[in-house]
From Swiss-Prot:
<dbReference type="GO" id="GO:0019843">
    <property type="term" value="F:rRNA binding"/>
</dbReference>
<protein>
    <recommendedName>
        <fullName>Large ribosomal subunit protein bL9</fullName>
    </recommendedName>
</protein>
<dbReference type="InterPro" id="IPR020069">
    <property type="entry name" value="Ribosomal_bL9_C"/>
</dbReference>
<dbReference type="Pfam" id="PF03948">
    <property type="entry name" value="Ribosomal_L9_C"/>
</dbReference>
<dbReference type="InterPro" id="IPR000244">
    <property type="entry name" value="Ribosomal_bL9"/>
</dbReference>
<dbReference type="GO" id="GO:0005840">
    <property type="term" value="C:ribosome"/>
</dbReference>
<comment type="similarity">
    <text>Belongs to the bacterial ribosomal protein bL9 family.</text>
</comment>
<keyword id="KW-0699">rRNA-binding</keyword>
<dbReference type="GO" id="GO:0003735">
    <property type="term" value="F:structural constituent of ribosome"/>
</dbReference>
<dbReference type="InterPro" id="IPR036935">
    <property type="entry name" value="Ribosomal_bL9_N_sf"/>
</dbReference>
<dbReference type="InterPro" id="IPR009027">
    <property type="entry name" value="Ribosomal_bL9/RNase_H1_N"/>
</dbReference>
<keyword id="KW-0694">RNA-binding</keyword>
<dbReference type="GO" id="GO:0006412">
    <property type="term" value="P:translation"/>
</dbReference>
<dbReference type="InterPro" id="IPR036791">
    <property type="entry name" value="Ribosomal_bL9_C_sf"/>
</dbReference>
<dbReference type="InterPro" id="IPR020070">
    <property type="entry name" value="Ribosomal_bL9_N"/>
</dbReference>
<comment type="function">
    <text>Binds to the 23S rRNA.</text>
</comment>
<keyword id="KW-0687">Ribonucleoprotein</keyword>
Length: 148
């Protein structure tokens, strides 16, 4: 019997996959527990529509990330920090501070965990901070650290 998996079933199939399985296994386990539906022409057409919709949504996410990348390349975030002698900062500027400044100054919300700044910013001036906007799209934020 051909079935369309509605959930991942370990060792048998992944969600959205169409597979031939024994009739007893399909009727007594997969269909009964709603792990799969029978592969009728109507269900197959519905599966194709779902795949097409998911592909369009993914494409839209990538386009949105690219638009955000373009926006980020044209702006500058100013972060003030306490400094000591010689322009050295007390502590460092963290990704949390950058995310808060970006939200306050430009009304753009980016998760601090998406910024790649392992040690923080330790000096005054300009720093380019890489940001992972999507699996495929990476941008940079220009951060200007000034004396408080």
């Amino acid at each position: 019997m051909k079935v369309i998996f509605t959930q991942d079933v370990k060792g048998k199939g992944k969600k959205g996959e169409v597979k031939e399985v024994p009739v007893g296994y399909a009727n007594n386990f997969l269909l009964k527990k709603n792990y799969a539906v029978e592969a009728t022409p109507g269900n197959l057409k519905q599966l194709e529509l779902q795949k097409k919709r998911a592909k369009q949504e993914r494409q839209q996410e990538i386009e949105d990330a690219k638009a955000l990348k373009e926006t980020l390349s044209n702006i500058e975030v100013e972060v003030s920090a306490k400094t000591g002698e010689g322009g050295k900062l007390f502590g460092s500027v963290s990704t949390k501070q950058i995310a808060e400044a970006l939200k306050a100054q430009h009304d753009i919300k980016i998760d601090k965990r998406k910024m790649d700044l392992p040690n923080g910013i330790h000096s005054l001036g300009y720093t380019n901070v890489p940001v992972k906007l999507d699996k495929e799209v990476e941008g940079t934020i220009r951060v200007h650290t000034v004396e408080q």
